[in-house]
Amino acid sequence: HEWMDVGAWVYENFDDVVRVDVAELDMYDDGGAMTYRAGTKLVTHANTAKIYAVGPGGSLHWLPTAEVAEALYGATWYVMVQDVIPGYFSSSYVSGADLSDMYPNGTLLQVGEEMYYVMDGDVRPFADSDAFDANNFDYDNLIEVDDVDAYGAGESVTGEETGLAGFMPAESSD
């Protein structure tokens, strides 16, 4: 089953899953649909030809051309694209700035052995692989680039940071 492949990257197995009654589940608020984690996928939906990069909190950053997508995400950028159900798309994601030559917040970049987290126009270097791992990042989501000269130098990531390690819901515009 396809869902088993998705589950495999989260947990080694399902041994710690606890079954609960629907009545118990109903005691909790519905948190809505989960967005893709920033920097891991590009998204679209059936009612548009637009492709978006996902930033923190489900912010969407339109890639206006295939050339921009290729320049940022490589020649096989299209393998990162995931279809999102249109209803989830409009209710779970929020608009962000369009992309041209800079990566959105939440993108993981790699120059040689150095790894960086993009944040507000800066790149934050990871002090070591332990700092990377502590924030639940996946090495498969690193984008190899020649340099990060266009970015400012941010504070080093030295360990777990709540804003990096966990899901951060989008801010409501209400």
Question: Which ranges hold each PLM region?
Answer:
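Short, surface-exposed polybasic-aromatic patches that bind anionic ligands, especially phosphate groups
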Residues: 1-174
